[in-house]
């Protein structure tokens, strides 16, 4: 807490900003018990203070300050903060943070008129509802440049922090001033703009335009003047606020690079134009209408043809017409001057007033209905003439366009008659359109004027949006305003609670995410998302027949009951009807949708718009020049073909677009939040309603903001910046001369400082601090700097003093020496020898002098030569300096160009960021739409499910509704009776109120007369007493202030001297830095020279490497040519050898012939000789050629060896050069690192010195201005003191005379005791009126301080007089009599005193004028000093620019160095490549030798392949042997069958004999058998039908499965691998299928055999003459057996069908694998043919077996065998089904993986929008890895399948071996018996499954039937519900109509 002296700079605002030192000490010493002092919850006051009396069983008894005793729960008691935290400035510092603590802190500060309070990271302000002196100019200067913790909370502090952040962080800032309507947002916005206009003035007067003779102010004046103009046209009185902004504005104040004002612009949002034509009772229209009618400028009344009575104009008089807190006359003057300052021309100004007046006249236009027609006609033309005159229109055309507008019908235009209502609505729409367009045009003109075209870098945006509104009648405007506030609150919540915590997570700080539950997304989505309120409204606007009712119904259908934030309001008595309610963050608002469609479409009369476009009033024509009328559109379509709907944009769509732009702007800035609070609803100063304030605190997230500030780390700074700024705290912690990471340096530095280590955390890039710790570090840094500076000053002063002392000592010694010599000379002066010495001495020295002259001439000549040389050098240096200056200028131009390019790049970057944000928003909208669609689908399905449940409930509801209807009718009658009684009581009360008001008026009139008499006398007395007390007080104040000013002046002079010394030191340090910079430049030049040398070396080495590469290539080409020559020589040599062999062969043949011939002729001998000679010649040639070839080969080998040796030497040289370059590279790196570190230290030192210079310059300028002001004040005060002392004597004499009069008057005031209270109230009102007058007087004369003090003294004297009035009750009669006598005598004296006072007042005015003149001169000096400061700032900026240029040079050098590094690496790579090529050439030399070895390897591989082929042949032979084995087995089976055949034939013969014997008997029972047969056939037919039905069902299932399998086969190429697995199984399946077919045929034949057996058994029974009963039993047994056989046949059929299905499934795979199968089975064709032959033999034998009747047992056994085979088939089928199920599962898994991959791909695409190509590459690599894993898995599966096949083959071989073994026959028979038992159990299971399927079928049909019945019942119930709804609506409408 600062002392009272520190607060003195705030002037009279100090007590309103911070509590005094005395109050703080009292609070600390106040007794306080922390255990018993608490806040307790209380129903009326929300929370009250109290003390705990007792605690029992979770209950606490508390005694409140009012004396009441409350017993509450533990959680309703909150501990109180200690007294030192009373009125604390930052609530985040409180010990106990809870709602009552925050509430009472705000309340106590508000009671002391401290309206600003910090709440963590933002500021809370409470509306005082009165004027406070906290915005004076001295307050602005006091806050300038102050840190947040150095000054009390204020809107100026927030503004200055934003300004400083903008300068330091180089980031755009925004100040968001939010709160409910009437909370003070507009006032705070004005103060922010005032602050920026004051502290960041440009200092340049704006040039006046030659065209307009109007006065225009500076840019800061124009920015300030924009507010009064916009408030006049955009602000109005509402229920909650006298000056409510009815539009939103975002004011951007742009600053240049130096922080000076550059320009400004204003964006406005959603002007409430409906207020132009309609206001509620307690409201009024825009201020401008009432300013014009205030008659402050009578010329406006005449020009606009209006009266001064607002009630003459219905558009502006529907509510109130005056506001107590607004002076419309003064505001008109302010508005008019603002128009002039903002540079509007006189013509534009007149047009603004004219259009405003025309809007007023529009409200008086009257129309009537024509007789016998519905059309409207004008009811008089006077008003229309005025409106048309003001708009420069023809009144007849205007009325015609209103009553008979032209409408397009087809391709023609016709005039259409309008009704009175339509014309009235059209007039209102035109008035609103004219006003709105004029307002928007004014905003664009203001922006044009504020755009000064100066360079601008950053901006601070101030947002002032209409506050949250809850009125009795809330329309579309309120929805838009509340929606804007909802979005801003969501932005605040996201910024404060979400982004802050995400920053912690991103930086790696340990942090648990806190959900504060402040998400407003539900309400925002309800309004703005697809199918939200705005979406439905815009959709309805597109339909021509849409109405408010259809809009309401759509809202109810879409959101009622589905969204928690959307409700249907309950009808309230006495209030306007509401159609729906929305739950906003600030409360529930009831909205009325009447007229929303028209408001949203905003239709205009095109004919009138066309008249406006042709108006002679340029402004009006310009306003509507962009509007597209119907006729213009038609013309446009003929010419250019403009689309119809392109210009149609609804109000809500435009509003959302502007709001989205605003949110985008805010997201791109660093926001500062100011939360405005309404203390009470009655606008009473000083009063605070607890519940209202608590509601706003909860909604605004104040407590949550404090919590995140306390728990989190709101301050953060980069490691490098922290190290640079706070290194001074402990320089020894960071070692000098060695590199250390910024993070480690920061950790060491913080560890070495004595602070709490839990108050900060280290992130990845920043260090984070708790609230307040950074301020503590700043204080420690300031103390350390002050300590260092004082030490430096002390050492400097000591050094200077020692130097001065040494000079003094030397001077003293020299004086002593001179004195001694003079004394000695005086003693010997008259001595004769001395005289002789004086005469001879010069003669002796003449010779020496000549020598000295000669030496001096030589030295002179030398110096002359040196001077000439130095002159030549100087000229050279001057020339160099000129060139360097040119280079410097060029570099500066380059820097400027690059800065401009950088600015353009930043703009492009901003645009890209905006487009990115827009695209993200679009993506988000699309995703949200998709989510909405999914939710709608889910809701529809839920509805469908609920319908069945609701059907049963609806019947109950119908009964309940009937009962409730009866109850409602009864209640209706009761309420009607109550209403009648209440109306009668109201009438009686109205009569009594009227009587009371009459009596009250009479009493007030009587009372007023007495008060007037008393007031006149009191005024006279008060003037005299005030004058005395004023003068005495002035004398005392002047004496005290004079002494203070003298002290201040001395302090200022000392500070000035100190600052001048500091400035000199800073300048010297700057010079040192410049010297260091020059040295660095020289070093850089040296490095550049070295780099150029290195570059030349590298280029030489590159050229050498290229030459070597060329040589290598030439040698390679030469080697290839030589190899080709060698090959050619080898070929020619081979040819020669061949020719030689041929010739030798011919020679031998010829010799043989010669020998055979025995003799030869001489000719033949000669021929032989010739041939031999040729042969010898050819042999010699051949030998010479071989020798030549060997010589050339040797020469080539030698050359090649030489070239290899040369290449080796060159490679060694290159390696040596490489080593040298690497050494130089490392040295260069070290030097570069040294330079970089030097540059960093220089730049840091430069930055620190620049900051010090800026602060010192600011302090110097402030001290100069303060010194001049103090000097001026001292002079003025001394003059006033003398003058006032002379006047005080006269006043004292007059006061003595008047005191006697006062004593007489005081004795006569005792009779007014009964009227004291009334007098006090009237006196307070008078005091308020005098306050207002005093404020106006102070503002006009710029003399606020003195007159305010005088006024306060007057108030004190009045209070004393009031106390005197209360005592003087008994002397009223005497007072009246004395007053009548004395008043006549004292009138003359009073008139004389009045004259004297007038003279003194005139003198005082003259004195004020003189003071004003002095102020003007001081202003000029101030301006001159400011110019000097700006020049200094320009110099600093130049140095900054030079430093930036050097930095840029350094960066360029770094880039060049990096390029050379890259080039070096490339050359290194090329050198390595050349080495590799040399090595490859060396290897190629040995290729010829290795070719033979490779051929040997190939031979070995061929041998291995041959072995493999032999192995395969052996495998095939083994397979053939296996086929032979199979043939052998089949032959054995054939033998067995032939034996069985012989046995069967023998039995057959026996059977035929018995058959012939029994044929006669068969005829008798034939009839009975036929009957049995018919029954059996019938049953079989029924079973066949059922089987067919099942078969069809199974066929359908099979077809569906087949389609699925086909799709799976088509979709996957992986099935090819599975086909390999199925190849072996397919062959077996074919065998099994054929076997099953044969078994089925055998079963059929067995069935027939059983019939024969039945006949035989019956014959045997007749022969044995058994009874009829035995025959029947046998028949029954036969029937059962037949049934069993039939069941077996059905099972066989089922298995056959299953095998057929599996065969169909396998056929598709067979087709694909047929080619490979044919290749593989070509060797097995012979075996298959033999197998077929055997199968045909078996079938023949089986055909013969059909005739056998007696071998039933063998047939049954075969049937059992067939059954076992079928079981095996079933098992194999089951296996196949398992494999298919496995395939299905694999398919599903693969589909799932495909979906996952697709999902990942979608995510990757989304991430690609954010992450870019790197993320895509990562995902692609991941996909490739997954694909590789899938392929490896598939390979493993294929290998497993191959192994499985091998194992299956091995198993088959083993089974064949076991079948050959005869010993296992018995075991196999036992196995067959067991299998038969299993088959029977399988039969039973199949029967049970069939029965279960039948029962399931029946259940399914039953359920389907029930479902259909339920749907029918639901349809019936739904129709009944609709009927009931219609009935209930009818009843509801009846009830409403009856009410």
UniProtKB/Swiss-Prot annotation:
Gene3D superfamilies: 1.10.10.820, 1.20.5.340, 1.20.5.370, 1.20.5.4820, 1.20.58.530, 6.10.250.2420, Kinesin motor domain, Myosin S1 fragment, N-terminal. The modification Phosphothreonine is found at residues 64, 69, 419, 1241, 1255, 1286, 1467, 1501, 1517, 1730, 1736. GO terms for cellular component: cytoplasm; myofibril; myosin filament; myosin II complex. It comes from the Eukaryota. The modification Phosphoserine is found at residues 392, 625, 1092, 1096, 1162, 1237, 1243, 1261, 1288, 1292, 1303, 1306, 1474, 1495, 1514, 1542, 1554, 1574, 1600, 1603, 1714, 1726, 1739. It holds the Pfam family Myosin_head. Myosins are actin-based motor molecules with ATPase activity essential for muscle contraction. The rodlike tail sequence is highly repetitive, showing cycles of a 28-residue repeat pattern composed of 4 heptapeptides, characteristic for alpha-helical coiled coils. Limited proteolysis of myosin heavy chain produces 1 light meromyosin (LMM) and 1 heavy meromyosin (HMM). HMM can be further cleaved into 2 globular subfragments (S1) and 1 rod-shaped subfragment (S2). PANTHER family: MYOSIN HEAVY CHAIN, NON-MUSCLE (PTHR45615), MYOSIN-2 (PTHR45615:SF39). Muscle myosin is a hexameric protein that consists of 2 heavy chain subunits (MHC), 2 alkali light chain subunits (MLC) and 2 regulatory light chain subunits (MLC-2). Interacts with GCSAM. This is Myosin-2. It comes from Sus scrofa (Pig).
């Amino acid at each position: 807490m600062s002392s009272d002296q520190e607060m003195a700079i705030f002037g009279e605002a100090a007590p309103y900003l911070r509590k005094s030192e005395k109050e703080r000490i009292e609070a600390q010493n106040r007794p306080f018990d922390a255990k018993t002092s608490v806040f307790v919850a209380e129903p009326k006051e929300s929370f009250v203070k109290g003390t705990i009396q007792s605690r029992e069983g979770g209950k606490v008894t508390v005694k409140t300050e009012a004396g009441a005793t409350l017993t509450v729960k533990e959680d309703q008691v909150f501990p109180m903060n200690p007294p030192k935290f009373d009125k604390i400035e930052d609530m985040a510092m409180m010990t106990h943070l809870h709602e009552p603590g925050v509430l009472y802190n705000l309340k106590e500060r508000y009671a002391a008129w401290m309206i600003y309070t910090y709440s963590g990271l933002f500021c809370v302000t409470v509306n005082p509802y009165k004027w406070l002196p906290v915005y004076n100019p001295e307050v602005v200067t006091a806050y300038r440049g102050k840190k947040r913790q150095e000054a009390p909370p204020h809107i100026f502090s927030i503004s200055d922090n934003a300004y400083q952040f903008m300068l330091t962080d180089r980031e755009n800032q925004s100040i968001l001033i939010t709160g409910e309507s009437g909370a003070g947002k507009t006032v705070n916005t004005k103060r922010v703009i005032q602050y920026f206009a004051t502290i960041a003035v440009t200092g340049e007067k704006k040039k006046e335009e030659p065209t307009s003779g109007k006065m225009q102010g500076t840019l800061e004046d124009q920015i300030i003047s924009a507010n009064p103009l916009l408030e006049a046209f955009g602000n109005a009185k509402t229920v909650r606020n006298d000056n409510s902004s009815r539009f939103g504005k975002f004011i951007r104040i742009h600053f240049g690079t130096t922080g000076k004002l550059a320009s400004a612009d204003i964006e406005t949002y959603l002007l409430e134009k409906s207020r132009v034509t309609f206001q509620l009772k307690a409201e009024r229209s825009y201020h401008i209408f009432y300013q014009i009618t205030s008659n402050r400028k009578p010329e406006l009344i005449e020009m606009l043809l209006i009266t001064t009575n607002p009630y003459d104009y219905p558009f502006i008089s529907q509510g109130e017409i005056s506001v107590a807190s607004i002076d419309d006359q003064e505001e008109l003057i302010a508005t008019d001057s603002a128009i002039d300052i903002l540079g509007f021309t006189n013509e534009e100004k007149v047009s603004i007033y004219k259009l405003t007046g025309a809007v007023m006249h529009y409200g008086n236009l009257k129309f009537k209905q024509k007789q016998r027609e519905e059309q409207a006609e004008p009811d008089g033309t006077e008003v229309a003439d005025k409106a048309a005159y003001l708009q420069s229109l023809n009144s007849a055309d205007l009325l015609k366009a209103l009553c008979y507008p032209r409408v397009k019908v087809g391709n023609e235009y016709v005039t259409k008659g309008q009704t009175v209502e339509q014309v009235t609505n059209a007039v209102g729409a035109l008035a609103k359109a004219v006003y709105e367009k004029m307002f928007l045009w004014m905003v664009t003109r203001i922006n044009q004027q504020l755009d000064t075209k100066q360079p601008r870098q950053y901006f601070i945006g101030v947002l002032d949006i209409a506050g949250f509104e809850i009125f009795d009648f809330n329309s579309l405007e309120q929805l838009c305003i509340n929606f804007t506030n909802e979005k801003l609150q969501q932005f605040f919540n996201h910024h404060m609670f979400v982004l802050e915590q995400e920053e912690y997570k991103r930086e790696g700080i340990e942090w648990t995410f806190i959900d504060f539950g402040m998400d407003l997304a539900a309400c925002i989505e309800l309004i703005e998302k697809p199918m939200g309120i705005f979406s439905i409204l815009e959709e309805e606007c597109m339909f021509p027949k849409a109405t408010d009712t259809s809009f309401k119904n759509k809202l109810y259908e879409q959101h009622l009951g589905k969204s928690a934030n959307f409700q249907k309001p309950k009808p309230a008595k006495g209030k306007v009807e509401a159609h729906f309610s929305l739950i906003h963050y600030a409360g529930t608002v009831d909205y009325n949708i009447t007229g929303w469609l028209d408001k949203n479409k905003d239709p205009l009369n095109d004919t009138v718009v066309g008249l406006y476009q042709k108006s002679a009033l340029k402004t009006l024509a310009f306003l509507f020049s962009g509007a597209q009328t119907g006729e213009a559109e038609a013309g446009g379509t003929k010419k250019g073909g403009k689309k119809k709907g392109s210009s149609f944009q609804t109000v809500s769509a435009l509003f959302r677009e502007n709001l989205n732009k605003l949110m985008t702007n805010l997201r791109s800035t660093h926001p500062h939040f100011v939360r405005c609070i309404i203390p009470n609803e009655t606008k009473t100063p000083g009063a605070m309603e607890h519940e209202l304030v608590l509601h706003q605190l909860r909604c605004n997230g104040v407590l949550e903001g404090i919590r995140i500030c306390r728990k989190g780390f709101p301050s953060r700074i980069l490691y490098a910046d922290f190290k640079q700024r706070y290194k001074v705290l402990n320089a020894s912690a960071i070692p000098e001369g060695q590199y250390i990471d910024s993070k480690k340096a920061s950790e060491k530095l913080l560890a070495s400082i004595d602070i709490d280590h839990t108050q900060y955390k280290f992130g990845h890039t920043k260090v984070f601090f708790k609230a307040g710790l950074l301020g503590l570090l700043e204080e420690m840094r300031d103390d350390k700097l002050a300590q260092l500076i004082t030490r430096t000053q002390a050492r400097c002063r000591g050094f200077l003093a020692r130097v001065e002392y040494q000079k003094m000592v030397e001077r003293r010694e020299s004086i002593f020496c001179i004195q001694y010599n003079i004394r000695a000379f005086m003693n010997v002066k008259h001595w004769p020898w001395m005289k002789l010495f004086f005469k001879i001495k010069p003669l002796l020295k003449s010779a020496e002098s000549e020598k000295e002259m000669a030496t001096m001439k030589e030295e002179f000549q030398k110096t002359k030569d040196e001077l000439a040389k130095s002159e030549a050098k100087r000229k050279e240096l001057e020339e160099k300096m000129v060139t360097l200056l040119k280079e410097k200028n060029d570099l500066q131009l380059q820097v400027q160009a690059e800065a401009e390019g950088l600015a353009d790049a930043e703009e492009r970057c901003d645009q890209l960021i905006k487009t990115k944000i827009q695209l993200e928003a679009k993506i988000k909208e699309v995703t949200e739409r998709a989510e909405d669609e999914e939710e709608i689908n889910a809701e529809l399905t839920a509805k469908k499910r609920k319908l069945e449940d609701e059907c049963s409930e609806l019947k109950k509801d119908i009964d309940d509704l009937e009962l409730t209807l009866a109850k409602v009718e009864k209640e209706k009658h009761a309420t009607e009776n109550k209403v009648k009684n209440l109306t009668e009581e109201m009438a009686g009360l109205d009569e009594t109120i009227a009587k009371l008001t009459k009596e009250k008026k009479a009493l007030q009139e009587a009372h007023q007369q007495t008060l007037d008499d008393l007031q006149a006398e009191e005024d006279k007395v008060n003037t005299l007493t005030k004058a005395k007390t004023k003068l005495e007080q002035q004398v005392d104040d002047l004496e005290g202030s004079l002494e203070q000013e003298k002290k201040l002046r001395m302090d200022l002079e000392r500070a000035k001297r100190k600052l001048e010394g500091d400035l000199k030191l800073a300048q010297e340090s700057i010079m040192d830095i410049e010297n260091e910079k020059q040295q660095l430049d020289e070093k850089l030049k040296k490095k550049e020279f070295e780099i150029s040398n290195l570059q030349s070396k590298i280029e030489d080495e590159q050229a050498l490497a290229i030459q070597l590469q060329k040589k290598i290539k030439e040698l390679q080409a030469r080697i290839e040519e030589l190899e080709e020559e060698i090959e050619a020589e080898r070929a020619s040599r081979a040819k020669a050898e061949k020719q030689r062999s041929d010739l030798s062969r011919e020679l031998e043949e010829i010799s043989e012939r010669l020998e055979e011939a025995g003799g030869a002729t001489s000719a033949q001998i000669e021929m032989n000789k010739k041939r031999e000679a040729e042969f010898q010649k050819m042999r010699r040639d051949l030998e010479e050629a071989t020798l030549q070839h060997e010589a050339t080969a040797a020469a080539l080998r030698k050359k090649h060896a030489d070239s290899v040796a040369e290449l080796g030497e060159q490679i060694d040289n290159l390696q040596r050069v490489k080593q040298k370059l690497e050494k130089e590279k490392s040295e260069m790196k070290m030097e570069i690192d040294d330079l970089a570190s030097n540059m960093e230290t220089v730049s840091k030192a430069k930055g620190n010195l620049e900051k010090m210079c800026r602060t010192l310059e600011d302090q110097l300028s402030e001290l100069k201005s303060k010194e001049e002001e103090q000097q001026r004040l001292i002079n003025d005060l001394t003059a006033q003191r003398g003058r006032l002392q002379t006047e005080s004597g006269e006043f004292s004499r007059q006061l003595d005379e008047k005191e006697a009069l006062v004593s007489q008057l005081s004795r006569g005031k005792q009779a007014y005791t009964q009227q004291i209270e009334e007098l006090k109230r009237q006196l307070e009102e008078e005091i308020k009126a005098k306050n207002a007058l005093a404020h106006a007087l102070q503002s006009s004369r710029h003399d606020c301080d003195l007159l305010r003090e005088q006024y306060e003294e007057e108030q004190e004297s009045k209070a004393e007089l009031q106390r005197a009035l209360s005592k003087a009750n008994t002397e009223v009669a005497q007072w009246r009599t004395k007053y009548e006598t004395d008043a006549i005598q004292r009138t003359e004296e009073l008139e004389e005193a009045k004259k004297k006072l007038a003279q003194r007042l005139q003198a005082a005015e003259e004195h004020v004028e003189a003071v004003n003149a002095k102020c003007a001169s001081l202003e000029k000096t101030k301006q001159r000093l400011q110019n000097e400061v700006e020049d200094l700032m320009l110099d600093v900026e130049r140095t900054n620019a030079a430093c930036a240029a050097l930095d840029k040079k350094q960066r360029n050098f770094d880039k060049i160095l990096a390029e050379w590094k890259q080039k070096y690496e490339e050359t290194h790579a090329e050198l390595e490549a050349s080495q590799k090529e040399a090595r490859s050439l060396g290897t190629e030399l040995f290729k010829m030798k290795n070719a033979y070895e490779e051929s040997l390897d190939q031979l070995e591989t061929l041998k291995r392949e041959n072995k493999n082929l032999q192995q395969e042949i052996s495998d095939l032979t083994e397979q053939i042997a296996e086929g032979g084995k199979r043939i052998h087995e089949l032959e054995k089976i054939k033998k067995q069958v032939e034996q069985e055949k012989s046995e069967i034939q023998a039995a057959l013969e026996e059977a035929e004999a018995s058959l012939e014997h029994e044929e006669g008997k068969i005829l008798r029972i034939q009839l009975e058998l036929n009957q049995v047969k018919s029954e059996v056939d019938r049953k079989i037919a029924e079973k066949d039908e059922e089987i067919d039905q099942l078969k069809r069902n199974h066929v359908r299932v099979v077809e569906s499965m087949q389609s699925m399998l086909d799709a799976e086969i088509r979709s996957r190429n992986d099935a090819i691998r599975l086909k390999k697995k199925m190849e072996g199984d397919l062959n077996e399946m074919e065998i099994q299928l054929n076997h099953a077919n044969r078994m089925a045929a055998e079963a059929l034949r067995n069935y027939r055999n059983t019939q024969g057996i039945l006949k035989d058994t019956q014959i045997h029974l007749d022969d044995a003459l058994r009874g009829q009963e035995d025959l029947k039993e046998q028949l029954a047994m036969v029937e059962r057996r037949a049934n069993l056989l039939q069941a077996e046949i059905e099972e066989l059929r089922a298995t056959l069908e299953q095998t057929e299905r599996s065969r169909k499934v396998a056929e598709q795979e067979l087709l694909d694998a047929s080619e490979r199968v044919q290749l593989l089975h070509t060797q097995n064709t012979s075996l298959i043919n033999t197998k077929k032959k055997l199968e045909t033999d078996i079938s023949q034998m089986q055909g013969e077996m059909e005739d056998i009747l007696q071998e039933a047992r063998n047939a049954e056994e075969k049937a059992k065998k067939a059954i076992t085979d079928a079981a095996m088939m079933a098992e194999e089928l089951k296996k196949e089904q398992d494999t298919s199920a496995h395939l299905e599962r694999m398919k599903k898994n693969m589909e799932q993986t495909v979906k996952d991959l697709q999902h990942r791909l979608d995510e990757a695409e989304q991430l690609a929008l954010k992450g870019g190509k790197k993320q895509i590459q990562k995902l692609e690599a991941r996909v490739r890895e997954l694909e590789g894993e899938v392929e490896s898995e598939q390979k493993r599966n294929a290998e497993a399948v191959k192994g499985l096949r091998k194992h299956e083959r091995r198993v088959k071989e083993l089974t064949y071996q076991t079948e050959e073994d005869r010993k296992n026959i018995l075991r196999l028979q036992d196995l067959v018996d067991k299998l038969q038992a299993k088959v029977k159990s399988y039969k039973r299971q199949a029967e049970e499954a069939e029965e279960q399927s039948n029962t399931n079928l029946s259940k399914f049909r039953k359920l389907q039937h029930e479902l259909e019945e339920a749907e029918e019942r639901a349809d019936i119930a739904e129709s009944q519900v609709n009927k009931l709804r219609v009935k209930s609506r009818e009843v509801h409408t009846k009830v409403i109509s009856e009410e």
